[in-house]
Amino acid sequence: MFGYVIADLGRLTEAQRLRYHSVYCGLCRALYADYGAAGALALTYDMTFLTLLLAALYEPEERSGAARCLRHPVRAQQWASSEFTAYAAAMNCLLAWENCRDDWADEKKISAAAAGALLAPGAKKAATQYPEKAAAIRRALGQIAQAEADRTGYSETPANAFGDLMAELFTVRDDRWTDGLRRFARSLGKLIYFMDAACDLQADRKKGQYNPLLLLGIGSGAEFAPQLRLLAGDAAEEFERLPIVQDAELLQNILYSGVWTRFEAAFRPQQEEQA
């Protein structure tokens, strides 16, 4: 379920694009420093959003600079990081490893097994640093796997479990913002779960794999767009309750536009036909 919480680059200003890229590069540097080349290869924009959000909410001291790297050996890239960058890197590594485990369990992909083996040392390190988070991730993914294995009927248990996983990831402190962060992250998690289900619907139907929309009798992922917009509205409502000033427009771009990028790329022709 990686790759949904991304920016709509075409609607960003040049300054916003540079900011987004610098935080992304900062996360990549943290992954490489803490978890090696395998960790850096698991880099996602989803955790870039988490870094931006936590930094916007808590406004910690930030470090920045420019440096070359394996991906950009010629031209130095601007980077920015804060105390939340290392945390997001750890969560990125854990989630990437769990994703490889799930791909191997579900489809026996050799590539997933190989990537998982490379990520395992880093994931173990991250789990040692954040044992409660690692346990929560494993528990939520276990609930999802169990619910998906039980095909007796439609259930929102997997979506709720993924929402709980996101709520745990987004909670880094126990303070007055904790409840709001958890509500927002839970809403975002449910949106991502069902959006992923919509995008995977046809492939899952062909392979005979679990998909909640199949159990609802949905013929095409595009048909589920109205329900997704309701879920997106719930997430947006919770986000707007947070006292976000720093990078507010960038975060809004991701939530209100970027998060739809993959869905619209998959279903735009169908949506235009239905309009």
Predicted regions and their residues:
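Acidic catalytic motifs of isoprenoid enzymes
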Residues: 1-183, 190, 194-229, 237-247, ...
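A glycine-rich phosphate-binding loop feature that marks nucleotide/adenosyl-phosphate handling sites
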Residues: 253-257
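Short, flexible loop/turn segments with low-complexity composition
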Residues: 248-252
